[in-house]
């Protein structure tokens, strides 16, 4: 699984430079769109990096003229150093830039440097960004580069969403990058409303899954042509091709069929899109509607009854279930009329989703929970944090009730009004 704490897990040192003779001159023409793929694979995903590159090459005939698909590739393979390459329309991998030293791809400054270099190599009017690697939504350990890993086999560094948002905003403020046309997160648990709010100034759309995704990630042979579309054609094309691929049991390999036999029943990957121009309205509406919860919103130390609502992450490090479906929460809290009013705003901010009540989870407690999820609730494939008592929430290394306050969304929610400090 591409899982836990958004993160680009990479084990190496600092960027020092590159050999001029190994790198190609910056083209003078400006393309219509360049899609940047940030492949942080210097970890336990290293072996599947090139599998996805090959899939991209299979779909490369769908790249329009005057558009580019460019990948930053960082793998844990011998003495190989990170490099930037273009997947051409002719299904070739054309190396554009080679680094001579390893560096932490999870360092926000290095993240910014790589994206800036891509804009120099393949300048365009519009840019899209694919985040490829490990992730776990809004969960943070600190607001600096964490010194220990939450997942994997090596000691590595991680980048939190707040840091990513600042890095992208810095590039935007410097006129290096315009506001991104989209961010497609091909990593776990990224579709939480907290992330959408944090990234609202740097991208038009955020797409991905609120849950774990398969280790193989997106079927890029089908996804690549969708990356160069716009509006609803863009997000529906990506979501539908991703969802339909895994819903077809014939597309699963032997190990997937053996490990997750329930996938034969047509389950897939929950997927959604956030339209960031409406996320501020959704924050304000949700803040107000919490006050109107039927019977009143519970005061500390009580919290809403979330029983049977789908949650998208079971954290085995502290035995906590977290990231409950936002739409289902609000449906349970509100009267029918108030939910209808709130849902009007929600559907503007989350215009499309495909739900599955089971997915390829590596966690046994999560798999057991699938049978308890209420299929009659309205799900929106975006999670929302709710403060609660208990392991993982009130104490421990992650202490969700405290660390969630790093995010602007939870500052708008103002959980203190319900007694949560």
Residue ranges and their predicted role:
Residues 73-92, 103-175, 187-188, 193, ...:
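Catalytic-core segments of thiol-dependent peptidases
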Residues 31-42, 91-101:
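Acidic/histidine-rich, surface-exposed loop or edge segments in extracytoplasmic proteins
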Residues 120, 144-185, 190-421:
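Terminal, contiguous helix-loop blocks that mediate binding/assembly
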Residues 4-13:
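Sec-dependent N-terminal signal peptides
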Residues 46, 59-98:
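Active-site-surrounding "flap" and adjacent substrate/cofactor-binding loops of secreted or lumenal enzymes
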Residues 31-34, 63-70, 123-128, 176-182, ...:
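Loop/turn elements at helix/coil->beta-strand transitions in domains of secreted/extracellular proteins
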Residues 1-4, 19:
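Positively charged n-region of N-terminal signal peptides that target proteins for export
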Residues 13-34, 386:
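Bacterial Sec-dependent N-terminal signal peptides
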């Amino acid at each position: 699984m591409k899982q836990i704490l958004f993160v680009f897990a990479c084990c190496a040192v600092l960027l020092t430079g590159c050999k001029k003779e190994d790198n190609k001159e910056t083209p003078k023409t400006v393309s219509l769109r360049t899609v940047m793929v940030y492949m942080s694979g210097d970890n336990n995903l290293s072996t599947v990096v090139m599998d996805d590159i090959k899939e991209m090459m299979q779909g490369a005939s769908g790249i329009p003229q005057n558009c580019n698909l460019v990948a930053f590739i960082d793998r844990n393979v011998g003495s190989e150093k990170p490099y930037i390459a273009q997947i051409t329309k002719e299904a070739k991998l054309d190396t554009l830039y080679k680094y001579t030293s390893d560096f932490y791809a999870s360092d926000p400054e290095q993240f910014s440097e790589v994206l800036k270099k891509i804009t120099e190599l393949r300048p365009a009017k519009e840019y899209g960004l694919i985040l490829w690697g490990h992730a776990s939504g809004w969960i943070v350990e600190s607001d600096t580069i964490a010194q220990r890993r939450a997942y994997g086999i090596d000691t590595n560094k991680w980048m939190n969403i707040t840091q990513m948002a600042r890095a992208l905003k810095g590039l935007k403020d410097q006129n290096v990058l315009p506001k991104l046309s989209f961010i497609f997160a091909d990593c776990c648990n990224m579709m939480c409303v907290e992330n959408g709010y944090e990234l609202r100034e740097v991208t038009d759309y955020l797409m991905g899954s609120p849950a774990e995704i398969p280790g193989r990630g997106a079927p890029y042979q089908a996804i690549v042509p969708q990356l160069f579309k716009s509006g609803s054609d863009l997000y529906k094309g990506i979501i539908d091709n991703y969802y339909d691929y895994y819903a077809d049991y014939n597309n699963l390999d032997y190990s997937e069929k053996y490990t997750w036999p329930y996938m034969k029943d047509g389950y897939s990957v929950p997927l959604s899109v956030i339209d960031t121009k409406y996320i501020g309205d959704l924050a304000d509406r949700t803040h107000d509607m919490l006050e109107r919860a039927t019977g009143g919103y519970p005061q500390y130390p009580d919290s809403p009854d979330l029983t049977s609502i789908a949650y998208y992450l079971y954290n085995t490090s502290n035995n906590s279930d977290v990231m409950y479906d936002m739409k289902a929460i609000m449906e349970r809290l509100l009267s029918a009329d108030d939910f209808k009013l709130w849902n009007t705003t929600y559907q503007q901010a989350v215009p499309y989703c495909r739900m599955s009540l089971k997915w390829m989870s590596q966690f046994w407690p999560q798999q057991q929970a699938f049978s308890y999820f209420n299929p009659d609730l309205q799900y929106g494939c975006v999670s929302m944090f709710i403060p609660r008592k208990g392991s993982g929430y009130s104490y421990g290394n992650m202490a969700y009730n405290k660390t969630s306050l790093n995010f602007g969304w939870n500052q708008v929610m103002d959980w203190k009004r319900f007694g949560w400090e």
